[in-house]
Amino acid sequence: MTTFLQRDDFAVTARVLGALFYYSPESHETAPLVQALLNDDWQAQWPLDAEALAPVAVMFKTHSEESLPQAWQRLFIGPYALPSPPWGSVWLDRESVLFGDSTLALRQWMRENGIQFEMQQNEPEDHFGSLLLLAAWLAENGRHHECEQLLAWHLFPWSSRFLDVFIDHAGHPFYQALGQLARLTLAQWQAQLIIPVAVKPLFR
């Protein structure tokens, strides 16, 4: 039986979403993706219902006084407190810290499965964008069992809450649309997941 993880569109959508959450919109990784989302062609290639995507596509193209790089800086870098921090341990750790117990559990799981994933800097591996990029890499390399575990154990337990807060506080139509696109896409993945999603308490 072919699972959704084995379809090409899973790896593509995971990589697109991961890059847009992880890299600056001006970077060579994401600049072409940003331009693609400002056109209508992408909707036909995204594995979701066209009716659900239509309002998202409109929002991507909505004008904002704040530039996209400024919005990305505010949402993902600082210097002020991030409205919806993109690291799992901030949501899963009682103290809402980086490099919390959930990050250590992810590292242990990666070691046990022989997974090496280079981060840009000395930052936690449980960044929402980097986990999506890792899921894409696992799917592309035929490691579908590990990909399912990554989603069920290390991403889905906190991603819905993160995306809800991210959308509410994005403050920029492009990133609000990106959050909605991610929420719709991940909900579809979770509905098709074979193994159960781990139930973990959230502290934000």
Curated annotation (Swiss-Prot):
Gene3D superfamilies: TorD-like. Keywords: Chaperone. Transmembrane segments: none annotated. It comes from the Bacteria. InterPro entries: DmsD-type (IPR026269), DmsD_chaperone (IPR028611), DMSO/NO3_reduct_chaperone (IPR020945), TorD-like_sf (IPR036411), TorD/DmsD_chaperones (IPR050289). It holds the Pfam family Nitrate_red_del. One of its GO terms (biological process) is chaperone-mediated protein folding. The lineage of its organism: Bacteria, Pseudomonadati, Pseudomonadota, Gammaproteobacteria, Enterobacterales. This is Tat proofreading chaperone DmsD. It comes from Salmonella paratyphi A (strain ATCC 9150 / SARB42). Required for biogenesis/assembly of DMSO reductase, but not for the interaction of the DmsA signal peptide with the Tat system. May be part of a chaperone cascade complex that facilitates a folding-maturation pathway for the substrate protein. One of its GO terms (molecular function) is signal sequence binding. PANTHER family: CHAPERONE PROTEIN YCDY, TAT PROOFREADING CHAPERONE DMSD. The keyword Oxidoreductase does not apply. The gene is dmsD. Belongs to the TorD/DmsD family. DmsD subfamily.
